Amino acid sequence: MSKLKITNARRKQRVRIALRRAAGGRPRLSVFRSSKHIYAQVIDDQKGETLASASSLEKTMREGGKTGANIDAAKAVGKLLAERAVKNGVKEVVFDRGGYLYHGRVKALADAARESGLSF
């Protein structure tokens, strides 16, 4: 395994351990990004169910002409996810960046979710 993959795997483990300690029963906002799209979901780990989700693959996003590979799409996904989560009664979450650096698309999604009503 390359040194970069080992470093990324260790970072992901550290993030998960810290989240478990800090969660305090709050749902987790999990982010996954690929080279072409970005996905986010609010997960209740105690019940094992997804409370809200959004991605750049959704029809409303594609009709808007936004690809998932840029910051604008990440902002739109964050806003959409926050609206759905607030509608389902979730206002406080723990942000799970999934080992990704808090920069670029991940940061844009988090900022948009905060602006739309989620607190973390």
From Swiss-Prot:
GO terms for biological process: translation. Pfam families: Ribosomal_L18p (PF00861). Gene3D superfamilies: 3.30.420.100. GO terms for molecular function: 5S rRNA binding; structural constituent of ribosome. Keywords: Ribonucleoprotein, Ribosomal protein, RNA-binding, rRNA-binding. SUPFAM superfamilies: Translational machinery components. InterPro entries: Ribosomal_uL18_bac-type, Ribosomal_uL18_bac/euk. GO terms for cellular component: cytosolic large ribosomal subunit. Signal peptide: none annotated. It comes from the Bacteria. Part of the 50S ribosomal subunit; part of the 5S rRNA/L5/L18/L25 subcomplex. Contacts the 5S and 23S rRNAs. Belongs to the universal ribosomal protein uL18 family. This is one of the proteins that bind and probably mediate the attachment of the 5S RNA into the large ribosomal subunit, where it forms part of the central protuberance. NCBIfam families: L18_bact (TIGR00060). This is Large ribosomal subunit protein uL18. It comes from Afipia carboxidovorans (strain ATCC 49405 / DSM 1227 / KCTC 32145 / OM5) (Oligotropha carboxidovorans). The gene is rplR.
